[in-house]
Amino acid sequence: MVAIRLLQLLLAALLLSGCTFFFDVQDSVQPDPEPDSRQQKIIFDRIQQITQSMKEVTRSEVSNVGPNEARSGPEKWTVCSRGNSGNEVRYFTFFLKGETVANWRPAVINDKCETRSFSPFERDR
């Protein structure tokens, strides 16, 4: 009886560890390289569209592509944007997947947007 319980426990542990291994391998097989210059132009154009649609945010600027410092999502790369909202400066984080903006939100401290360099949006980026 003890041998059967031990085998059941061993089988359950083996099956559960296999699931974790499978997902780790899948993530490492599909790397997400930093977007190239063509992809960055598409990304910056999309971010500019999004920031221009924000009624209360003016004079938006954008950072270069950087790592996802907060690691708050599966995306490896981010771009920060900042703009004036009344008397405040607001920061936003845009999460990138290839040449698309997968998601965005108001920046949090862990995004480290305040430490990035910003420049105005340019048509020739």
Predicted regions and their residues:
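Sec-dependent bacterial lipoprotein signal peptides
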Residues: 1-19
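Cystatin/cathelin-like cysteine-protease inhibitor module
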Residues: 20-125
